[in-house]
Amino acid sequence: MKTIFKSGVLAAAAVVLSAGLVAPVFARDLTVVSWGGNYQDAQRNIYFKPFSEKIGKPVLDEAWDGGIGVIQSKVKAGAPNWDAVQVEAEELALGCADGLYEKIDWDKMGGKDKFLDSAVNDCGVGAIVWSTAIAYDGDKLKEGPTSWADFWNVEKFPGKRSLRKGPKYTLEFALLADGVSKDEIYDVLGTEEGVARAFKKLDELKPNIVWWESGAQPLQFLASGEVAMTSAYNGRITGINRSEGKNFKVVFPGSIYAVDSWVVLKDAENKDAAQDFIAFASLPENQAKLPEFVAYGLPNKEAASKVPADFSKDLPTDSANMTDAISLNVDFWIDNAETLTQRFNAWLAQ
């Protein structure tokens, strides 16, 4: 149907032009981009569809896998076909510095004081607080791991492990497994000796690692029994527990948390509507619905107080879950991602 419609439009335009008339301009619908999976399914129900009904116009949504290069290519080519995009912290910092995003109208958002400090940026509005943590199947492991040292212990907990295929998170977890305290992780990783120490620890586990590249894969690996435990996004784990009745467990001590943000691409056709959408998605009464579907923390401070206790206990921002968690050091990864990625890839190929 899409092909037929486009062909008809082109034919009509050709007739108009041949008659010496100006061809009509067809406005593109507001397009919102997020991370896919059960998280985007929840967003569709909580944000996308209700906002579409509110404005009386379609809202399209697409999924992506991240990467500042994707946004750079769209913006620098002119007339980007995305409007509001959810980005990770590094993409927010790099894109804002590079002029890839519109400035946020914080008055429209209700004011900066409504949000956690880490959710406020000139170019972005915090969308979720999420964690990468240890996960395992509680039906298969009655006494599961409680630390990254346990994750590395294949004698006590036999079976394969899964980690994200890349240096970020993986190197931090290796150092935690080797006994580095959470408060010293980035100080140690900032030295050549610390990097070597992390890779040496990874050497121990390498024969037992199944690498994952998309957020859905850890769930698949656990469900199939291919791995005994994995690193995973906490919201994906609680999401599948609720939607499919799984008994997957999340281990918050030693987890790494970060804030994802909404941005509006520079010169996007629907930039004003995109700001309106972000304001709608940031309302406390709307954000408070998210933990019913996926257990991500909420940047709007009022929203957090509206979440029932049965759901709030699963959030990364719950006080008990934050106790031994680590904040992702965005500046460290902006400065070191390229070098450490090259080193990681070389290590992987050995």
Where are the language model's segments positioned?
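Conserved C-terminal helix/tail region of periplasmic/extracytoplasmic solute-binding proteins
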Residues: 322-350
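Early extracytoplasmic/lumenal segment of secretory-pathway proteins
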Residues: 28-95
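A ligand-binding cleft/hinge motif common to bilobed small-molecule-binding domains
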Residues: 92-94, 229-247
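Sec/Tat signal peptide C-region and signal peptidase I cleavage site
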Residues: 21-27
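Extracytoplasmic ligand-binding site segments that recognize negatively charged/polar headgroups
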Residues: 37-42, 81-82, 87-223
